[in-house]
């Protein structure tokens, strides 16, 4: 019996194009001005220190770390301080209504139905928890945050490592076999299955893929009670 659903965001609840074509360019274009304008903010200072450590050069000056952050965006690196800084920049964008968080209609519909059925819903994304909350809190369908019981990011572990899913199961105090993980990435699903989870692959573009995971084109294809 599935008691909790853990979902990815990019390519799963939300379109890849929203992240790649809206969020990433928005943060990239504003990274330098944001860092310079908030250089005395304690939170930003701590994140810059973490970014310098991740770059292997704690003595790096701010201009060089800005250049490194922009390069990491271009390389789509999943580096925790970068993701946190992106989240702070996106917060300004959501607040200014420069964009809304994209969530597929079928995902909204099924998430609401599962919530009403008493299934606990959680998010696991490489984006920071702050960024996750912003996306689901500012959608065209309204604030979806009340649907979710918790959020996880790379601080719990890498998404392609079984240990991350084991850690999440411990946090939820549930047997892994009672958790369903949703993603569009085979390696993430493999890691979750190795940890004992049930899995389902979203294939929103390009048709069915060769996979040993159950799959479907949208959330309406997911039947937790049958997995």
From Swiss-Prot:
UniProt catalytic activity: 5-methylsulfanyl-2,3-dioxopentyl phosphate + H2O = 1,2-dihydroxy-5-(methylsulfanyl)pent-1-en-3-one + phosphate
Top-level EC class as recorded in UniProt: hydrolase
Domain of life: Bacteria
Cofactor: record remark: Binds 1 Mg(2+) ion per subunit.
Pathway connected to this protein: Amino-acid biosynthesis; L-methionine biosynthesis via salvage pathway; L-methionine from S-methyl-5-thio-alpha-D-ribose 1-phosphate: step 3/6; Amino-acid biosynthesis; L-methionine biosynthesis via salvage pathway; L-methionine from S-methyl-5-thio-alpha-D-ribose 1-phosphate: step 4/6
EC number: 3.1.3.77
InterPro entries documented for this protein: Enolase-ppase_E1, HAD-like_sf, HAD-SF_hydro_IA, HAD_sf
Molecular function per GO: 2,3-diketo-5-methylthiopentyl-1-phosphate enolase activity; 2-hydroxy-3-keto-5-methylthiopentenyl-1-phosphate phosphatase activity; acireductone synthase activity; magnesium ion binding
Keyword vocabulary terms for this entry: Amino-acid biosynthesis, Hydrolase, Magnesium, Metal-binding, Methionine biosynthesis
Coiled coil: none
Cofactor: Mg(2+)
HAMAP family xref list: Salvage_MtnC
Function of the molecule: Bifunctional enzyme that catalyzes the enolization of 2,3-diketo-5-methylthiopentyl-1-phosphate (DK-MTP-1-P) into the intermediate 2-hydroxy-3-keto-5-methylthiopentenyl-1-phosphate (HK-MTPenyl-1-P), which is then dephosphorylated to form the acireductone 1,2-dihydroxy-3-keto-5-methylthiopentene (DHK-MTPene).
Stated family: Belongs to the HAD-like hydrolase superfamily. MasA/MtnC family.
Subunit structure: Monomer.
Protein name as catalogued: Enolase-phosphatase E1
Organism: Methylococcus capsulatus (strain ATCC 33009 / NCIMB 11132 / Bath)
Organism placement in taxonomy: Bacteria, Pseudomonadati, Pseudomonadota, Gammaproteobacteria, Methylococcales
């Amino acid at each position: 019996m599935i008691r909790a659903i853990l979902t990815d965001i990019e390519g799963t609840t939300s379109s890849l194009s929203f992240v790649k074509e809206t969020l990433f360019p928005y943060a990239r274009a504003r990274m330098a001005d944001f860092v310079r304008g908030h250089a005395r903010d304690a939170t930003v200072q701590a994140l810059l220190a973490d970014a310098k450590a991740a770059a292997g050069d704690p003595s790096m000056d701010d201009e060089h770390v800005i250049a490194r952050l922009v390069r990491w965006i271009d390389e789509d690196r999943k580096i925790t301080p970068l993701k946190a800084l992106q989240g702070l920049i996106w917060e300004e964008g959501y607040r200014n209504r420069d964009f809304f968080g994209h969530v597929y209609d079928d995902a909204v519909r099924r998430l609401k139905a599962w919530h009403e059925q008493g299934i606990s819903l959680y998010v696991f994304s490489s984006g920071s928890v702050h960024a996750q909350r912003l996306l689901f809190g500012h959608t065209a369908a309204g604030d979806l945050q009340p649907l979710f019981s918790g959020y996880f990011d790379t601080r719990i572990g890498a998404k392609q490592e079984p240990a991350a899913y084991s850690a999440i199961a411990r946090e939820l105090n549930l047997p892994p076999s009672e958790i369903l993980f949703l993603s569009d990435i085979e390696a993430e699903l493999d890691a979750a299955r190795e940890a004992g989870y049930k899995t389902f692959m979203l294939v929103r573009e390009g048709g069915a893929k060769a996979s040993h995971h159950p799959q479907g084109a949208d959330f309406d294809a997911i039947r937790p009670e049958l997995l």
